């Protein structure tokens, strides 16, 4: 398994798999196969894939620990950047075909429509995460500060779920499903943090062992 995860070709294969949804959308645009409301179709498709890639990204840490596959970490940055790629497409379909690049109209929407406000907040939160995803930024910020910044991906995922839930008016099964996944991952993360914190406190409070008697 380790040989498979560390192979450069596995990373290439994962990259190509991540591009399949984009390729499908491009093909549908070329064939004019976007349904009765093309803009709505594109917005929903890109929004769905944004949430999916956020969930994929959040799954990396628990999976690598639960299944003892540390090399899974090689794919986390790629999956996170694909989440950013699809949210950018989501935003472009809103700003372009929907709003006709009317920035004033967009800001009115952001201010007046709660589901857009929350979605826009999630998009903005992802921008610094994408920018600082490189090893150079880890060195500049320092490991701890970088980790604290990148934990905001959980807020992005929560905002994305709320955005989706408020958007749909009748069938809420998909946003509830995504919400359940994000909730489970967040609870796991909190549990892992409390466990580590408790272990660290226990080590500090434990009595030091007496030094061995060198005369014996």
Descriptions of predicted regions:
Residues 1-216:
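Membrane-embedded alpha-helical bundles that constitute the cytochrome b-like, heme-associated redox core
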């Amino acid at each position: 398994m380790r040989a498979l995860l560390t192979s450069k070709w596995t990373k290439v294969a994962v990259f190509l798999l991540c591009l399949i949804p984009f390729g499908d959308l491009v093909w549908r645009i070329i064939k004019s196969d976007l349904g009765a409301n093309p803009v709505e179709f594109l917005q929903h498709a890109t929004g769905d894939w944004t949430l999916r890639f956020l969930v994929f990204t959040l799954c990396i840490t628990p999976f690598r620990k639960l299944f003892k596959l540390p090399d899974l970490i090689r794919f986390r940055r790629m999956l996170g950047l694909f989440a950013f790629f699809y949210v950018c497409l989501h935003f472009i379909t809103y700003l372009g075909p929907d709003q006709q690049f009317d920035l004033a109209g967009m800001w009115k929407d952001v201010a007046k429509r709660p589901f857009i406000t929350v979605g826009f907040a999630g998009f903005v939160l992802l921008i610094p995460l994408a920018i600082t995803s490189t090893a150079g930024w880890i060195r500049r910020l320092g490991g701890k500060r970088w980790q604290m910044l990148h934990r905001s991906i959980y807020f992005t995922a929560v905002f994305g779920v709320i955005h989706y839930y408020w958007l749909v008016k009748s069938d809420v099964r998909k946003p509830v499903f995504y919400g359940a996944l994000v909730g489970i991952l967040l609870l796991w993360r909190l549990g892992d943090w409390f466990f580590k914190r408790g272990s660290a406190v226990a080590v500090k409070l434990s009595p030091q062992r007496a030094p061995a008697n060198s005369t014996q």
